[in-house]
Amino acid sequence: IGSILLFVSIVVGKTGYRFGVPTLLLFLVVGMLFGSDGLGLQFHDAKDAQFIGMVALSIILFSGGMDTKFKEIKPILGPGIVLSTVGVLLTALFTGLFIWWLSGMSWTNIYLPITTSLLLAATMSSTDSASVFAILRSQKMNLKHNLRPMLELESGSNDPMAYMLTIVLIQFIQSAGMGVGAIVGSFVIQFMVGAGAGYVLGKLAIRMLNKLNIDNQALYPILLLAFVFFTFSITDLLKGNGYLAVYIAGIMVGNNKIMHRKDIYTFMDGLTWLFQIIMFLCLGLLVNPHEMLEVAVVALLIGVFMILIGRPLSVFLCLLPFRKITMKSRLFVSWVGLRGAVPIIFATYPVVAGVEGSNIIFNICLLYTSDAADEEDS
């Protein structure tokens, strides 16, 4: 069954690419068609889907880090980091308040308290690295004013911020409130440990690749893959942000001389696509489309708000200090807030944690991701 799903996904993806349909979105649709409301393939374990998503996102972020050239991102390092941190926070705040206001309306069929509304917004607050890397490079866009590296830096580094917001809000809800000091401390520890571990382990990976004399050169990419998983795991064990660590480690490896670079890049590129397909398929299988119809209108309104108000407002506020960035560039960055599977992956965390209203969060995230990906790609 798995081989059939992979084959169908590749064929459908190739067909969709010709007509300008988002390839990654089609993988999600294939999973839904084969799922419980389609051909009847049963997959209901959110914890397994979360684990698959975690592995896939680690590989995607590391590969994205390898493709991020420091010379390209250096001129836009300031705005890129602000967008990936403050931008995510503002997007979550604005959208969370809108969801809270919307859920209190008599004509909506949901009611979410302010904390759950902010949690829903946090899961959707980051742009998707897989979608950004895939679309900007496959379409070969000739963007000026360093827009491509800015968007890639933002998308590669803002997932950790959205992840931290999601985890902190889940802890806040389950503990009936956390102190401001505990929240700030959690953010600082995750950032510091994640960044430090990514830098140190990235350096160690470079040294191992260049110093270890392995007779079979095909094992070098596998060695690096093992290092990706080790980096994520040890950082998570140290209470740091594993996603930030693997992204920084990827930047370190990609911007230094390493043995068998071509073989490693080819291996990682193929592996990234494989796990993107698997990730979207699993998330599609996990979904029950009939349940999404109940929140379709609300999800659509949230999507419209984020695309037309939430994202642009956050971008313009974040880029205010950077006067050299033109108005056209600000508008483009505001519009290209590409979404993919990351919000759905993060939406599995409330489900696994048993947060009240988690099924609503998951279904809205899926519908929003589908709408946003389709509108932004067009």
Report residues per predicted region:
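Transmembrane helical cores of multi-pass secondary ion antiporters/exchangers
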Residues: 1-371, 378
